[in-house]
Each structure stands twice: as C-alpha cells, then as structure tokens.
Amino acid sequence: MSDILENERVLRIGRSEFVADGIRSFELVDPAGESLPPFTAGAHIRLRTPAGAVRKYSLCNDPSERHRYVIAVKRDELGRGGSLSLVNDAVDGDLLPVGPPENAFRMSRAARNLLLIAGGIGITPILSLIRSL
C-alpha cells in the first residue's frame, strides 16, 4: 500500500469510543465543519494512523451522512501496527490524513432479496449496507 494518499484531506477525530472488547469506533469530521465527499454503502477510506501507517477501514455509517465518516477498528496484537496505533494512541481531537472514499463492495440495487452475513469486525461494511436500505 502506498504511503501517499491521493486527494488526501485532514480530518479530526470528533469522537471515539470502545464499542466492544478491543474494538474502538471513530467519528471523523472536517475540522472546519464542511461536508465530506459522498460515499456509497460498502465503501472504505485510506487513513494514515498516528504511527504513520496507511490502512483501509470500512465506513460503517449511513451514506446519506455528509458531516462525518465512522469507522470501527479492531486492535490486532499480531498486526503490522496500524490498528494498535489507532486504538492505543489516537485521541479525540487528533488530526489524521484521510483519502477519499473508494468502493469495491457495492450492493446491487437490482437485487430483490438480500442475505447479508458477516462475522467479527467484518460487520463494518455490512452496517453501512444495512443503513442504506
């Protein structure tokens, strides 16, 4: 993964909280209160952690919300440091470079019936899909 975020902008951690054992959610907002670029359900953002690592995190809020992005990060003791840096070191008010939303997990609007299955932290893109229905 590249260390350079294309079209990056700096967002502020507006609020964070532990939502489950080892999982912390982060609300990212524009420091000036401006609207954020739109995203579609299932999208993710690239984010530079406090330690400098660039990682992808699924957006889990409703795509109609333009005032914030919400991600959830699971602390991974055996990972390469991205999740540890966010979960352990990031504090509300911190500024983080973030790339624009991307989506490789689009839901078909033509589908008549949906069965959404997820486990563990894999629920994050599914939450956005559910909220968009």
What is each model feature region?
Residues 4, 84-133:
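FNR/FR-type flavoprotein reductase catalytic core
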